[in-house]
Amino acid sequence: MEIFVYHTPELTPDQSLPDCAVVIDVLRATTTIATALKVGAEAVQVFSSLDDLMATSESWPGEKRLRAGERGGAAVAGYDLGNSPLDCTSELMAGKRLFLSTTNGTRALQRVKDCPQLVTASLVNRGAAVDYLAQTQPKTVWLLGSGWEGGYSLEDTVCAGAIASLLREKGIDFTVGNDEVVAAQSLYRQWRSDLLNLFKQASHGQRLLKLDRLEDLRYCATEDLIDILPKQVSPGVLTAA
């Protein structure tokens, strides 16, 4: 198993896909996706475009759907939800499909939608991602951060480092595919005992703090809360593996 870390979808190699892509958007799309499936959502369907989300979701029964839209960290007017994992409750989500469009995470998912294996990870379900990689042993793996509008993000990189570090701790052998893997592990080693403070310093963490989303940061900075691994079952549609 050879692992590569890419900080944003724009930095991935052109005309290339891995055997397995692990998409990461800790603040907050992949945290929200895992949480929604954990509390009973039937599936999460992701869209880069808000217009595409609305058009597709119109064909779904109203009582069986929820629409979640986020841009710039804030909820989009006219949608049922924004992108907070704390809004994902079993009372709201059970048996429904969540139609989701966010600023960054859904773009990353679009980049690798044709991968043979596509899963999503965050700190809250890091262990589930590691277990999946250990069991399936894909030849090449991309840990793909979503970043922020094409730029680097601390939170996605530290999550990639957390995944690689846990693989090492469990004795699961892998080859380092690029220097970004080493850098991500180093960042995680430095901050693993103080992830919330790291998130407070991250640019997107600061955006969310200005929107009074401290509890979102606290939740997203917690490791191994959820044993669910979202996996793509058809383009853009994720269910619990």
UniProtKB/Swiss-Prot annotation:
InterPro entries, sorted: ComB-like, ComB-like_sf
Catalysed conversion reaction: (2R)-O-phospho-3-sulfolactate + H2O = (2R)-3-sulfolactate + phosphate
Class of the enzyme per the UniProt entry, highest EC level: hydrolase
Keywords from the UniProt entry: Hydrolase, Magnesium
EC numbers: 3.1.3.71
Cofactor(s), by name: Mg(2+)
Gene Ontology molecular function: 2-phosphosulfolactate phosphatase activity; magnesium ion binding; sulfopyruvate decarboxylase activity
Superkingdom of origin organism: Bacteria
SUPFAM superfamilies, per the entry: ComB-like
Annotated family: Belongs to the ComB family.
NCBIfam families: PRK00886.1-5 (NF002056)
Protein name: Probable 2-phosphosulfolactate phosphatase
Species of origin: Synechocystis sp. (strain ATCC 27184 / PCC 6803 / Kazusa)
